[in-house]
Design a protein with these regions (language model features):
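Conserved small/polar residues in nucleotide/adenosyl-binding loops
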Residues: 357, 361-364
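Extreme N-terminal signal-anchor transmembrane helix of membrane signaling/transducer proteins, especially
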Residues: 1-29, 33, 37
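Extracytoplasmic/periplasmic ligand-binding sensor regions of membrane-associated signaling proteins
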Residues: 100-108, 113-191, 197-200
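Solvent-exposed, extracytoplasmic
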Residues: 91-101, 180, 184-227
Length: 368
């Protein structure tokens, strides 16, 4: 009887386990999709925000490219007119400083002129003459075909050496030529502004968010738990050069990757304007964290249900066994001829009815 009772309790428990497993899988799948979609939106919005910021930088550069007086100054037409030359220098100098102050993403603005013409820049320093030819030759080296100078570049070493610029101050630069065709307006994108923006994004403890340029320069923001320090070495790339990053053709990608034996969800969104990308690595333990909580609760509920069912089964089966022993024991006494015995059972169930029926039968037999 005890085994049958346990079996009766076991069947609903098995169904409870199946319901728990099904619920966990559905919850895990739903939370995974929700988490993935939410973070894809975060990365895409970050991409769009930075892309819009870059469009403002392009517009700022084009503003100077179409200034007639500046174009004439850059090719040396005002070198014989000291008054006009000074007027242009002061006017453009004030204007580029105002542009720098008005846009948090602008590090510096440089006006690269012909060799015999003074350059203009927001970078403080003395009088520096133009480096147009050397600068152009460097930029042609970055060109895909050796002819067309790229608009967005990650480095301008010639300009850095000439003006004493630090490459850590900018992450990339936009450049365009004036209407005259000689000279460059160069605007550096401030690395610290992008770093601050990436730091404002929150994708969970242990996640890594990065801005990666076309040639592999990176700005990385690590979301470390309290008290934990970064193990990344200075200059070490997180995304560029990795197998999961190389040869990505789609503009947007999300996939699971493994790094040093640890699973991550990789998000990637590339900008059309600059070919730079916003990327993120989110530990899978964060992705599945809430679903794991549901799994743990389900396991706990099932275990408690099993324990309660076993205890109830033991109590019921024990009561049945005791009553069965009392009844069978008294029946054996009657069978041996003892008509004075009485059957007494505990409870108000069917065994009590059996006991009463046995008592009536016993009394009738005794009267006979």
């Amino acid at each position: 009887i005890r085994a049958k009772i346990f079996l009766c309790f076991l069947v609903p428990i098995l169904f409870l386990i199946l319901v728990g497993v099904f619920s966990y899988k559905k919850a895990a799948a739903g939370m995974y999709d929700t988490f993935r979609d939410s973070n894809e939106q975060t990365i895409n919005m970050a991409n769009q925000y930075l892309d819009v910021s870059n469009s403002f930088i392009e517009a700022e550069a084009l503003k100077y490219a179409f200034q007639s007086d500046l174009g004439k100054y850059m090719i040396g037409l005002y070198e014989t007119d000291a008054v006009q030359r000074k007027t242009v220098i002061n006017s453009v100098g004030s204007s580029i400083r105002a542009s720098q102050a008005g846009n948090d993403f602008i590090s510096n603005i440089h006006i690269v002129t012909e060799e015999d013409v003074q350059m203009l820049s927001t970078k403080a320093g003395g009088t520096v003459m133009g480096i147009y030819k050397d600068y152009k030759n460097e930029m042609l080296g970055y060109s895909d075909n050796g002819k067309k100078i790229p608009e967005w570049v990650d480095y301008h070493n010639t300009l850095d050496d000439t003006l004493g610029l630090k490459q850590s101050d900018y992450i990339m630069a936009y450049q365009t030529t004036p209407q005259s065709g000689k000279g460059f307006i160069v605007i550096d994108v401030k690395a610290s502004a992008i770093q601050q923006f990436l730091d404002s994004l929150d994708m969970g403890d242990g996640s890594i968010i990065g801005f990666v340029t076309q040639s592999g320069r990176e700005i990385i923001s690590e979301k470390l738990p309290d008290g934990q320090e970064s193990t990344r070495a200075d200059g070490e790339t997180v995304f560029y050069g990795q197998d999961f990053f190389n040869n990505l053709e789609d503009q947007q990608t999300t996939k699971e990757v493994s790094i040093n034996g640890k699973s991550y969800l990789f998000f990637y969104s590339r900008m059309e304007r600059t070919n730079a990308a916003v990327c993120a690595l989110v530990p899978m333990e964060i992705v599945n964290g809430q679903a794991d909580d549901i799994r743990n609760v389900t396991i706990a509920v099932v275990l408690i249900a099993c324990v309660v069912a076993v205890l109830i089964g033991i109590i019921i089966s024990t009561g049945i066994q005791k009553n069965m022993k009392r009844i069978s024991g008294r029946l054996e006494e009657v069978a041996e001829g003892n008509l004075t015995t009485k059957v007494s059972v505990k409870g108000h169930d069917e065994f009590n009815t059996v006991s009463y029926t046995h008592l009536r039968a016993h009394e009738t037999l005794a009267n006979l």
